Amino acid sequence: MAKPCGVRLSGEARKQVDVFRQNLFQEAEEFLYRFLPQKIIYLSQLLQEDSLNVTDLTSLRAPLDIPIPDPPPKDDEMETDKQEKKEVPKCGFLPGNEKILALLGLVKPEVWTLKEKCILVITWIQHLIPKIEDGNDFGVAVQEKVLERVNAVKTKVEAFQTTISKYFSERGDAVAKASKETHVMDYRALVHERDEAAHGELRAMVLDLRAFYAELYHIISSNLEKIVDPKGEEKPSMY
């Protein structure tokens, strides 16, 4: 006869696990009842800031201290000065766009925060999934659906992090080309275009972050009873 198998924990280890679970459930309660509503309000206020409501996108342009070379010499001058080649003017330190960097300073922490909160919710629900057995599993199906949606939000937030990194890469390439091919004005314009596009992307991120928080609040609060008590055996509670 096969021996029953299970995870055996020492008294101290079990105590530590129980403390972790209690802290997790308390964090989840704090997130749902206090953090979520406050964050939605904060992001709504942030969207009213002047820095996220720029109508004249040309005002976002950062100065490019890249010297413009002299026009090419005439043919006769080229013949007489073949051995005298003028070097392309070199540019010095080229800082980033301070206005965009300031916006990134506001938005990046919000992206990281939502990602961490998604992980919190996922971990919390996973600890509420009951023992798998025959019977009424409708509540478990609800848990799985909520987990699926929270994971989808987390994936989209991770894409925001990629978008932010991509901004620096693309802008850096454009600045490098503009400083190397100093006579090509399109490369300079490309730098400005990238900054203007970044402003729109950052505003859209804040809109999405607010929408994601609102969705999390709705989907969790609407299904809270099934999330915390999927079998319908106990009085619903966050913990």
Curated annotation (Swiss-Prot):
GO biological process: regulation of G1/S transition of mitotic cell cycle; regulation of proteasomal protein catabolic process
Taxonomy, superkingdom: Eukaryota
Gene3D superfamilies: Proteasome activator pa28, C-terminal domain (1.20.120.180), Proteasome activator pa28, N-terminal domain (1.20.5.120)
Keyword list, A-Z: Acetylation, Phosphoprotein, Proteasome
Acetylation listed as a keyword: yes
SUPFAM superfamilies (UniProt xref): Proteasome activator
Residues carrying N-acetylalanine: A2
Compositional bias per record (Basic and acidic residues), positions renumbered to this chain: 72-86
UniProt cross-references to InterPro entries, sorted A to Z: PA28_C (IPR003186), PA28_C_sf (IPR036997), PA28_N_sf (IPR036996), Proteasome_activ_PA28 (IPR009077), Proteasome_activ_PA28_N (IPR003185), Proteasome_activ_sf (IPR036252)
GO-annotated molecular function: endopeptidase activator activity
GO cellular component, one term: proteasome activator complex
Pfam families: PA28_C, PA28_N
Residue numbers carrying Phosphoserine: S10
Disordered: annotated span: 65-86
Entries under PANTHER family matching the protein: PROTEASOME ACTIVATOR COMPLEX SUBUNIT 2 (PTHR10660:SF6), PROTEASOME REGULATOR PA28 (PTHR10660)
Subunit structure: Heterodimer of PSME1 and PSME2, which forms a hexameric ring.
UniProt record similarity statement: Belongs to the PA28 family.
Role description: Implicated in immunoproteasome assembly and required for efficient antigen processing. The PA28 activator complex enhances the generation of class I binding peptides by altering the cleavage pattern of the proteasome.
Protein name per its UniProtKB record: Proteasome activator complex subunit 2
Organism: Sus scrofa
